[in-house]
């Protein structure tokens, strides 16, 4: 799971002046951060059409030069503001458009680059959650204290502080009960004398009383589609939102809509449909451009059934010109929190930086031959029928080609379409390399439209992309033209088509567990519906990114299922990897599996069976490893999960780079973990020597075995961290890497690797340290080092070993079993950190030996003749030795695989 980084349009450094643009380049609001004048406290002029937010922060150490405040608003870009020292401590000021209601902020400490969108190593002060301040009047001022999550106000410049007193939430629990949460929990509402509920016309709603739970009871039911306000004397009015009511059976029965949403382009008409049950009005805005200019065309949507809104217009005008197609659009949605402009969550493309959706005739984006596009398996001679037939290679789009010197499309989708590319040593790279390696699927790190990269900039930028902006839109920075929304769609399809033509399937990394910010398009359209909240109205943060999506709510579930099936059907994708899948409820993932496999029974579905923090979703409903049995039952090819048991067993805990595992440190104590993974998570303690995890899988198809992924250190970096980089340790380090890979490739389950593991990928910082979380590191850290492959290099030799492992696995059904029993895997011998076992598949029998010790060990072959296909340095489909019997010597730090003749 990657860290959340929100999109930044950052500063240009001109002498000592930083210019920050917090929405678009032409909407700076006068935010020119100039040097402090001696003896004067920093101020900032606020131009007409803007309002101002000032944040004071006090740090006991008095040191502010390694800190800043990350601020954002209106779902737009974020900006990092450095502190100006003042009598209170430090202060920042930001001007925002006058229609801004809330501003989000994070006080960041331990910044390596204060004032810039660099998040590596930062520590959030006060709380890990995103914080928000509600603006009032032309100027809002808050005071913060280091280590304190509260916001304060002051009448004397910060000498005395009072908790900021505001109505934190007015929650419609039912149509007649409004639960009020105050920022100061000690404040109780005891009388109606200073309380009013106002409807959209400002008329008072009759009130019955107040119960002992700070709940206001109305005399008449409220209409969820009307914009009610709660007024309490001496507080700013707040909109009433049905946060709790959203989860009631009454709401679900009245507003769960199962029809098509989004834009539908027909031969004669174009229809628009949006689900916004709490809206009092919705207006469609049409733009000629995806980024610049104002909308001159507006259409009022009509209220439809179950909370939907719709508009249908003629596709062509009187002159035969398109009214909508290839133009851009947003919705202005009026709810209890005001009128906010939002991008349609169902938008299929967007303008640069995703601020406006695009209306497309999708057929016009298809490359030539697209109607015949299909994943036909590797080289046409290998069938991927079960998950266990797959061999997955995880890659970031930019990493793949950014260092291919003769690529015309460095860092772009189209780099996957190029053939004949070679590195400086004449070794095939790019797509040709993948075909030679033999993997069956590429797993693309997030390639939907994410927030953290400025698509309008030609400057080098990098992010993994785990900060979703527009889920159904391809990321624009990987297209050759990010401004024209048609290009990214067409080029994404070309990428998929080229990989399919090479016999390689495409798996998309999807991140439906959270959005880049809670101030998202979802929340502008239906405030508080799409996210989980704690009992006191604070966003639940099981993602570790400030928010989490409420997948258990029917319309969130519908969006997730609709989104996945859209990508599958429109882009011919062959599978999906779910980030932090533990934050999705079981019902949602079951429905995803059913719909995806109804369209393509061979599609792969897998995810991280854990969360990124505490969540309000019940543990019994989480799609996590402990619930893998509840999720899949006895199903083969259901929803697979990453096997962290074998991962840590092979190389040591990912939470401690100095820890070593069975393969990297000959730790016998980790052997049970390894054997648990060898049998695909099946319950069989006789095989594991008594070890069992907290979960079990009835089928190896539902378990992803791996030792490296984009998260954490690379396998090679872990080995080098412990063993050093001296030439004297090179042979043993290479052996440990090969043994680790061999364990994954000879285990039952689905083999998975981070791209470049097979060429000893390293992520080394400029100072020589190893980067374990390179989500926003430089290209130099993240790129695949293709030029490391030469005919004599250890990287090339290691790649050849991986190639042989993959080929042997593909030629050996016993390693790809979809169903097993207690007799499938049998221990032959155990001798410390050396184990020999058999895998039996009918008449096919393998003897596999893992020797993690540094000395050779003798293993006696069972009766019959055996052929050796894999040893410590060689692997493939041609026998290394044939017709072997009796005792065999197994080299130290190696895997040997014998097949019965």
Please give the residue ranges for each predicted region.
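Short proline/glycine-enriched turn/loop motifs at strand-loop junctions of beta-rich domains
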Residues: 61-65, 100, 182-192, 275-281, ...
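Short, surface-exposed alpha-helix to beta-strand junction/turn motifs within ectodomains of secreted
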Residues: 65-75, 183-205, 280-298
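Conserved alpha/beta catalytic core and glycan-binding cleft of carbohydrate-active enzymes
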Residues: 360-364, 369, 593-594, 599-760, ...
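The feature marks proteins involved in alpha-glucan
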Residues: 31, 35-61, 87-174, 217-271, ...
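C-terminal beta-strand-rich structural cap/linker in extracellular carbohydrate-active enzymes
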Residues: 104, 880-901
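Substrate-binding/active-site clefts of carbohydrate-active enzymes
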Residues: 349, 396-571, 589-600, 604
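C-terminal motif of bacterial Sec signal peptides marking the signal peptidase cleavage site
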Residues: 20-22
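Loop/helix patches that line or flank the sugar-binding groove of alpha-linked glycan CAZymes
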Residues: 698-866
